[in-house]
């Protein structure tokens, strides 16, 4: 069943790690605008399924997978995170993907920096353009404000509470302009203990987003 009513369809997904079956014919259909939760005990294969959806290297370096993935009605092969991001898929991982010595803005805008021309640009072209920190700060602050996070984007990530780091990961995905599907691999596990009220408010905000 290939239907553009569905943003993602995963059919008969199978995955083994070194001969050990992890996924055995999993099907997942998500309509546009829906919110789904995958429930299961540790080792059930939830993260593996999400890694397949986001094209993580660990999947393809261990023999790939079997089955079909359809995104917005089109059969596709998501062979890398870049492919996933180009389709409009974002993912917040269990493990932090932030650079501690960078500011919040630098982490949110990493590999998506905004450039502006300067006096050398007409002669040297795009390679002479400089980073537009003002615009990047403004856009990053909007993402933080959307989550109700009271932080300044110029702050360094290093030393922030664990819960804040997870919010920054979420803000990074929200900031992507072509975002069509957002995947969370247990991102609130560390936040529930440390920041229950903020976590609940953020989840409500994301459900409206």
Task: Enumerate the predicted regions with their spans.
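Glycine-rich phosphate-binding loops of nucleotide-dependent enzymes
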Residues: 1-209
């Amino acid at each position: 069943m290939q239907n553009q009513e569905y943003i993602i369809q995963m059919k008969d997904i199978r995955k083994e790690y070194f001969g050990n079956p992890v996924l055995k014919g999993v099907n997942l259909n998500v309509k546009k605008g829906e919110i789904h939760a995958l429930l299961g005990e540790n080792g059930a294969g939830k993260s593996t399924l999400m890694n397949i959806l986001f094209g993580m290297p660990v999947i393809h370096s261990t023999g790939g997978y079997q089955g079909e993935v359809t995104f917005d009605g089109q059969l596709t092969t998501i062979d890398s995170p870049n492919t996933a991001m180009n389709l409009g898929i974002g993912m917040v991982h269990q493990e932090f993907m932030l650079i501690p010595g960078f500011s919040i803005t630098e982490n949110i805008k990493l590999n998506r920096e905004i450039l502006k021309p300067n006096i050398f640009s007409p002669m040297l072209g795009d390679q002479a353009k400089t980073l537009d920190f003002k615009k990047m700060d403004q856009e990053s602050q909007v993402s933080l404000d959307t989550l109700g996070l009271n932080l300044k984007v110029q702050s360094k990530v290093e030393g922030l509470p664990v819960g804040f780091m997870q919010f920054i990961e979420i803000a990074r995905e929200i900031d992507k302009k072509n975002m069509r599907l957002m995947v969370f691999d247990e991102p609130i596990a560390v936040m529930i203990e440390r920041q229950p009220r903020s976590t609940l408010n953020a989840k409500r905000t994301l459900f409206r987003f």
